[in-house]
Amino acid sequence: MRRISAVSAVAAAAVVALAGCGTGSGKSSTDSQKVVPTSATLSGSITFQTWSLKNDKFTPYFTKLVADFQAAHPGTTVNWVDQPGDGYATKVTSQVTSGSLPDVINLPPDIAHAVAKTGDLLDLTKNVPTLATDYVKSGLTAYTYADINGGADSYGFPWYLGTDVSYWNKEMMAKDGLDATKPPKTFDELVAQAKIMHDASGGKDYLMSRSPGLSDIVNSGTKLMTDDGKKFAFNTAGAAAMIDKYTTAFKAGYLPSNVLNDKYEGNTSLFQKGQVAWTTGGGQLIDSTRQSNPTMADKILPSPALDTAPLYVQGLSVSSKSKNAALALAFAQFATNDKNQVAFVSLAKGFLPGSAASANDPQFSKSDGTPQGDASVIAYKDMQAAVNFTPPVWTDAMNTLLNQEVAKAMTGKETAQQALDNTVNQANSLLTQ
């Protein structure tokens, strides 16, 4: 199963180019805004495309899903196809330009945005009256775009979602005078406790172990883009102040010295080795750690993510050019109803359903009293208000640029404001290429 994440630089460039070219017929906008008649008996066939999900683990689930739908609607056929993990955005680009986009298609928000810009995805708000009550709000928001009809449309049913939970090494924290049952809740509290750990250990132990990124900028109270979604605009005083706090902490020795260079192993790796006392990860991190490092797993306690949690989401979209839109819409709703979503994430450990009704399911709302049980419930609660921080037009090249500029600021080569100005200006230039 493919992890929910941004697409590669090449793939991102492909979908941005697709949106920029406005590929599609002259009636694409009208197609996306149409209302699909749903009163007639369903019949005929459609194609349903997933992304890197045809394997021993998930194939039985999808085989049954399709069979159940066809049994409930005699005379219908759902042809399930799956695309490999690599090159998916490029494949979707090819499908749009050739007019062969599947009727129901698995898309993350960034690729969905590019396809929606061409008018090739159906607006679900006009076709599903219960959309806002049937699905998790945070997931729906990820498929609304400010630069398409002012953000009034929605182009994906939230399907399987993820978020981050904070994890703490209680043994390491206790040694340095901190209590993992009273962890930081905000970035400022994190810095304060990082100082305590640093001072108590003589600079040998670390609570913080990563440089700031987009999520930190958003959590500083900064909007990443203009209200119309057409330009980056995160070079604010608030964002600069946040980077300055990281810089001060870095210079004081609260972060590992290699956090800004190629020798940096990553926050999670350092945590698993017992070299830092805090990391973030999905709701199943303790269980996954137990498989590789049982001793470490017993030292971990979870808590909600600092400030606002990030959202990772995959969804199902409906082609506005489908020749059997009624069947496509019905199947997409069936595949993402509460029963089928819960069944799917029971196989996809660490992910959460995008159905609103899952909030009433004890497996997501009640802990069994173990740290892992607590983490699972925390993840589900965090997901409700989580935010997809990454704009759909943000590419790997832009992220590399941000990291380089932040590193310059944290090492005193330029001010935080200069770093943000440079990043915003160059990222906006990349948008027009």
Residue ranges and their predicted role:
Residues 68-138, 175-177, 277-278, 353-354:
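Extracytoplasmic "Venus flytrap"/periplasmic binding protein-like
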Residues 71, 75-77, 129, 147-212, ...:
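Helix-loop-helix "hinge/cap" segment bordering the ligand-binding cleft or interdomain interface
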Residues 109-163, 297, 381:
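Hinge/lid segment of periplasmic solute-binding proteins
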Residues 51, 243-330:
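Extracytoplasmic/periplasmic substrate-binding proteins
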Residues 125-138, 183-185, 200-201, 222-242, ...:
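Short, solvent-exposed loop/beta-turn-alpha elements that line the ligand-binding surface or hinge
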Residues 1-47, 71, 428-433:
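Short, low-complexity disordered leader/linker segments with a strong preference
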Residues 41-54, 76-81, 104, 155:
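Short, well-ordered beta-strand elements
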Residues 374-423:
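C-terminal capping/gating helix-and-loop segments adjacent to ligand/active sites or protein-protein/ligand interfaces
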